[in-house]
Structures are given as structure tokens and as C-alpha cells.
């Protein structure tokens, strides 16, 4: 093997093995490592909570959210609801629902800061207006707070299964994420809850920088920063419909990626490690490596493979790696065609969504670097 062949093989192997470590190696590690999480039940279940629903240009979607909220099983607890929105207050509204109308659009983070000023319960629950909670969601969330070490609880995010439209491959990603959250919580702590359903102890809330793009990740980090863990409540479910089409899903992915790069710039990995080494280990694989390394590793694997084709085109190693990469990207391309044609993908959803996700991450990085991602995100239309 020549020096050039060795170099290009090393580049290719770094890319492929790095991706394997990020997406499959980490779950295996946290599965095999001893649990740091030692749950206790030293406190009674909270009996009062506030549900905050931020909404902008939701229209009928907000009406449906209110119907869903009123149908929740809250007979055992006192639940206050704060709706902060641009829409006018309905003429008839239950007494436990507080309506805050915003005339100026300042972004979600600013809206949450304003709503938090009205909270007087020990627990606050954030839930996006485009999601529906299962009837027992709030009860399941509150039960996790019997452990005094828990500062926040992340619910389960899922997609409604009774719809035939939307980006079908989105579901396979959230199934993977749900499995990882279970492992994260078992090992130590969930690494960032989703804004669809996230609860915290009200006293631990730290006002958000108004220009925050990923408010849920910032809220989660502030909880960990104060020495608390984030639990996972898989039976508290927030369901939303899939994105209407690939363009809408790409818009959502790109803005999330832009927010991720903003968070990484403001919270360097070494600073996270100094506060919580165990959380930093999780954050390294769950967020940092995905955003900073994964797209680059995919490019490295392609560059190295191209070099191998140039210096050693007849090598069995080159033939094997090239065949594997060509097959993978061909399946991803086929998945794209089928997804665009709204044809059921089956297992083809995995290679397609993997490539699609990392392309969106690169676009999100470009948008953030060039300052083109506004805090005033446009609402994406769900199916």
C-alpha cells in the first residue's frame, strides 16, 4: 500500500468510523456504562402547575390547542394556562386561562420571558401551539418531580400516525431520538428537552437572551448549570403532524441547525465540561459532534474515497468502500424521489433522512454564519 493510498484510506476511515461512533457508538456506550442516575422519591408529587402556550399566527391551530388543553386529565391538580399570542382574546374563556396579546413581534424567547413573569406555581410546562398532548401528559410530567435532583422533565415528542400526508421519513428520526432519550435519562440526564413538551421547576428559570434561536436547549442547559438533571417522561406525549412537504421540513431543520450553532458558540464544550463532566460527555456526542463534526465527516469520507479511486482504483479495499458509498447515496437519492412523490419509503427512509438532515445542518451553519437566521422564525405549515 502506497503512502498516498494509506492517507486517503485514513481520511475515508475517519469519516465513516466517526459517523458510526456518533450515531451508533454513543448509544452502545451509555447502554454499557454504569448508571449515574439514582432516582429517589423524596418529595410529594406537585399538585399545581402552569402551562405556557406561545403562539404566533396559528389561527385555527390555536383553537385546536385550547380544545386539547381543556380535555387534559387535570382533576387531581390545579393547572393554570397562559396563552401568549398575537391573536385577540376570545369572548368566552375559562377562568384558569390567562390570555396575553402581543402587539409587537419580538420572538419566542421574549414571549416566554414575559409569560414567566405571570407564573406563581412550582412547576411550569412549555408546550408549542401546534402540538396535542395526550390526556395524562401533565400528570405523567409532574410525577417525575418527586425526585429532588430533577430540575426539568422532557416529554415524548411524536408524530400523528393517522395522517397519510407529510414527510414520512421524519418519523424514523423521532423514533431514534426517543430511544436515545431513554438511554440518556437512564445513564444520567436528558440532553435538552424539546419545546413541544418541556417542564421545569419555576424557581430554576433563568430569563432567556431575547435573540435565542433554540429556547428549549437554552432552558435545559440553565437547569443543568444549576446542578440538576433532566428526566424523561415517555408517557407524556406531545404529538404533531409531519411537515407538509420536504421544503417545509428543510426550513424547520435549517433553523434548528442555525440555533444549534448559536448555542455552541455561546456555550463552548470546555465550559460545559467545567460545570458537569458527565453532562459534557453526553453533550459531546448528542449535540456538539452532530453539529460540528458529522457533516464534515460525511464530506471527508467522500473526499478520501475519491482519492482512493485516483491512486488505487483496482484495490479491493477501494472497490468495497466505493461500492458501499455509491449504494448508500443511491438509496438516499431513491428515497428522495419516493418522498417527493409521497410514496411510502419503508427502510429507505433511513439513508434518505440521514443525508437530508446533514445537508440541512450545513445550510443552517451557513445561515447562522452569515447572520441570515432571524429570531422571528416563520411558522412552518404542518400537514
Task: List the predicted regions and their residue ranges.
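Catalytic donor/gating beta->alpha subdomain of glycosyltransferases that bind UDP-sugars
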Residues: 145-176, 211-212, 220-285, 353-367
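Short, acidic, metal-binding catalytic loop of nucleotide-sugar glycosyltransferases
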Residues: 67-78
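Membrane-embedded multi-pass helical conduit in multi-pass membrane proteins
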Residues: 4-5, 21, 43-44, 240, ...
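Acidic donor-binding/catalytic loop of UDP-sugar-dependent glycosyltransferases
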Residues: 129-144
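Short aromatic/hydrophobic "clamp" motif used to bind/position activated sugar donors
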Residues: 124
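Conserved donor nucleotide-binding strand/loop of the catalytic core
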Residues: 80, 93-118, 164-169, 174, ...
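N-terminal membrane-anchoring/stem segments of glycan-assembly enzymes
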Residues: 1-43
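Cell-envelope/extracellular polymer assembly enzymes that use nucleotide-activated donors
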Residues: 47-50, 80, 218
Amino acid at each position: 500500500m502506497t503512502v498516498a493510498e494509506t492517507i486517503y484510506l485514513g481520511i475515508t476511515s475517519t469519516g465513516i468510523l466517526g459517523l458510526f461512533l456518533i450515531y451508533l457508538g454513543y448509544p452502545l456506550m451509555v447502554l454499557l456504562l454504569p448508571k449515574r442516575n439514582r432516582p429517589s422519591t423524596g418529595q410529594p408529587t406537585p399538585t399545581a402547575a402552569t402551562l405556557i402556550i406561545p403562539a404566533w399566527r396559528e389561527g385555527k391551530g390555536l383553537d385546536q390547542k385550547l380544545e386539547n388543553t381543556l380535555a387534559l386529565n387535570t382533576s387531581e391538580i390545579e393547572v393554570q394556562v397562559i396563552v401568549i399570542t398575537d391573536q385577540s382574546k376570545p369572548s368566552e374563556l375559562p377562568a384558569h386561562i390567562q390570555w396575553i396579546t402581543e402587539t409587537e413581534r419580538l420572538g419566542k424567547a421574549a414571549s416566554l420571558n414575559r409569560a414567566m413573569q405571570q407564573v406563581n406555581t412550582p412547576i411550569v410546562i412549555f408546550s408549542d401551539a401546534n402540538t396535542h398532548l395526550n390526556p395524562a401528559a401533565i400528570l405523567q410530567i409532574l410525577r417525575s418531580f418527586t425526585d429532588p435532583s430533577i430540575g426539568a422533565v422532557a416529554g415524548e415528542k411524536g408524530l400523528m400516525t393517522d395522517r397519510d400526508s407529510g414527510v414520512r421519513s421524519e418519523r424514523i428520526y423521532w423514533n431514534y431520538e426517543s430511544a436515545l432519550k431513554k438511554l440518556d435519562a437512564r445513564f444520567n440526564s436528558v440532553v435538552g428537552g424539546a419545546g413541544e413538551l418541556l417542564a421545569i421547576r419555576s424557581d430554576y428559570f433563568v430569563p432567556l437572551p431575547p435573540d435565542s434561536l433554540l429556547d428549549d436547549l437554552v432552558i435545559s442547559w440553565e437547569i443543568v448549570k444549576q446542578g440538576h438533571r433532566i428526566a424523561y417522561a415517555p408517557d407524556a406525549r406531545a404529538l404533531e403532524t409531519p411537515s407538509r412537504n420536504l421544503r417545509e421540513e428543510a426550513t424547520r431543520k435549517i433553523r434548528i441547525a442555525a440555533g444549534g450553532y448559536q448555542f455552541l458558540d455561546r456555550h463552548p464544550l470546555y465550559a460545559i465540561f467545567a460545570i458537569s463532566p458527565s453532562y459534557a460527555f453526553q453533550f459531546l456526542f448528542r449535540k456538539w459532534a452532530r453539529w460540528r463534526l458529522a457533516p464534515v465527516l460525511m464530506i471527508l469520507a467522500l473526499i478520501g474515497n475519491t482519492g482512493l479511486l485516483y491512486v488505487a482504483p483496482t484495490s479491493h479495499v477501494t472497490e468495497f468502500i466505493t461500492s458501499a458509498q455509491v449504494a448508500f447515496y443511491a438509496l438516499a437519492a431513491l428515497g428522495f424521489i419516493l418522498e417527493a412523490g409521497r410514496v411510502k419509503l419503508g427502510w429507505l427512509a433511513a439513508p434518505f433522512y440521514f443525508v437530508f438532515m446533514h445537508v440541512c445542518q450545513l445550510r443552517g451553519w451557513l445561515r447562522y454564519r452569515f447572520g441570515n437566521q432571524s429570531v422571528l422564525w416563520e411558522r412552518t405549515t404542518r400537514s
